[in-house]
């Protein structure tokens, strides 16, 4: 995990430690939104991981869907094309 991703993971870890036991475990998805956020930060880094986490949290509401929603695997970046010949 990048240093910035570690910093962005701190509020998620604090939520899991402090607030989650009080509000209950009511996430509509598997993995939970906080687990999804931590995994997204781990796999994708700070920018893309936080974007994926924000999108997921935005989908988690009573009128939204539910079920299994894993973090997508990172796409391999292709090297730039070199001129032929």
From Swiss-Prot:
The keyword RNA-binding belongs to this UniProt entry's keyword annotation: no
Disulfide topology: none
Q: Which domain of life is it from?
A: Bacteria
Indicate where this protein resides in the cell. Answer: Cell inner membrane
Kindly indicate where the leader peptide sits in this chain: none
List the residue ranges of the region (Disordered): 62-85
Q: Which Gene Ontology CC terms are recorded?
A: plasma membrane
Tell me which family the UniProt entry assigns to this protein: Belongs to the UPF0161 family.
Per the entry, what this protein does is:
Could be involved in insertion of integral membrane proteins into the membrane.
Put simply, this protein is called Putative membrane protein insertion efficiency factor
Query: From which organism does this entry originate?
Result: Ruegeria pomeroyi (strain ATCC 700808 / DSM 15171 / DSS-3) (Silicibacter pomeroyi)
């Amino acid at each position: 995990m990048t240093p910035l991703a570690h910093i962005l993971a701190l509020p998620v870890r604090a939520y899991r430690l402090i607030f989650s036991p009080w509000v209950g475990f009511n996430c509509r998805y598997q993995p939970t939104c906080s687990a999804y956020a931590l995994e997204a930060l781990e796999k994708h880094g700070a920018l893309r991981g936080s974007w994926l986490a924000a999108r997921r949290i935005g989908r988690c509401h009573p009128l939204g869907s539910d079920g299994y929603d894993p973090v997508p695997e990172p796409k391999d970046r292709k090297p730039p094309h070199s001129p032929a010949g």
